[in-house]
Amino acid sequence: SFRNEGLSTRHNPEFTMLEYYEAFTSLSNTIEFTENMIKTASKKVNESEKIKWGDDEIDLGNFRQASLADLVLAENKDLTQDDIDKMDGMKLLELFENSVEDKLIQPTFVIGYPVEVSPLSRRNNDNPEIADRFELFIGGKEIANGFCELNDPDDQAERFSEQVKAKDTGDKEAMSFDEDYVIALEHGMPPAVGVGIGVDRLVMMITNQTSIRDVLLFPQLKS
């Protein structure tokens, strides 16, 4: 894969991505599959679920789940649950990235992402303000991103329209309106869950490397 982004010890414009999808399954089943796959990969290399990554001791035998809102609330003692409930989704995500993300050392599936920051994800049946989505963090780094695919063409068109408004107001990460995709959804798509894993970061973790350049065949990052 390619992204027009800068170089760092955690990012490279060219990187390896593993994506997998399954129809007629649940988010919880996909979370379990992802956890077992990572455990198996580590055991094959390290013969243990307890590994070292840089200065951190990581226990891959103990994955947990936590909601994004609860994690933000726990790290920001000046905020109340009412503050969180009233907060814009983009602001909540920004707080998470700035105050929580790098503290998620042990394997954590973060769930409960706001719909505003999940434009391709299906709404949760019990709470339509959040998406059926997870991100997996290990060692303070995002390893995987997965969600139930949004297969409602009307909802998807509405989400794209909101993304266009965000782009017009300066959001550089907002998406354009993909009319072809909406038309494809109108022809029908089964319920499905998809996951993307950054293979380079996963290899970094399993082999205890602290720079992405050490797991790339042709790194652009200088020593």
Task: Map each language-model feature to its residues.
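Active-site-adjacent structural elements in folded domains
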Residues: 3-4, 56-58
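Short, glycine/acidic-rich hinge or "gate" loops at secondary-structure transitions
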Residues: 46-57
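A common structural junction motif
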Residues: 38-45
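A translation/RNA-centric and nucleic-acid-associated enzymatic feature enriched
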Residues: 1-29, 33-37, 63-223
